[in-house]
């Protein structure tokens, strides 16, 4: 059995990204674990598992952090979760294909906190752009770069 594994912070993960991950898990015979506080539809596969955690703030995040190992990849748009993953020596990739690294995570956390403070003071900051075909392609390309090592 491979030491490599992909974890997905699945509650907010776009469906097109899940589909890419399902195909990759099958193609590479690689364990894929989707963690969510609700049931997620997954195809029948010996490589794909779903973990349903209890409701509550960051319960899925805590589960992933507890189980992740340095050879694992975590798919998440949650920047604080990505920071914890990096601290454990694993890799974190967001659904738009951006790899979180030791070099960029502090800047990402700072910007996230700044935007949260602005919203807290009543400033309308807007949200991220809609998930696009370009985002899907960027994710697939980044995932493929990681899969080459597996």
UniProtKB/Swiss-Prot annotation:
Q: Which InterPro entries match?
A: UPF0178
The entry's protein name is UPF0178 protein Sbal195_1808
Task: Tell me the leader sequence span.
Answer: none
Domain of life, per lineage: Bacteria
Family classification:
Belongs to the UPF0178 family.
| SS bonds (residue pairs) | none
């Amino acid at each position: 059995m491979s030491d490599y594994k992909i974890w997905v912070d699945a509650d907010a993960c776009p469906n097109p990204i899940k589909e890419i991950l399902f195909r990759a898990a099958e193609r590479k015979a690689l364990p894929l674990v989707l963690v969510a506080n609700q049931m997620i539809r997954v195809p029948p596969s010996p490589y794909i598992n779903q973990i349903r955690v209890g409701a509550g703030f960051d319960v899925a995040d805590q589960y992933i952090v507890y189980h992740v190992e340095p050879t694992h990849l975590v798919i998440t748009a949650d920047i604080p979760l990505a920071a914890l993953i990096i601290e454990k020596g694993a890799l974190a990739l967001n659904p738009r294909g951006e790899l979180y690294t030791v070099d960029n995570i502090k800047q990402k956390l700072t910007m996230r906190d700044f935007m949260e403070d602005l919203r807290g003071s009543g400033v309308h900051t807007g949200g991220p752009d809609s998930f696009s075909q370009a985002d899907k392609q960027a994710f697939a390309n980044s995932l493929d770069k990681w899969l080459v090592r597996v």
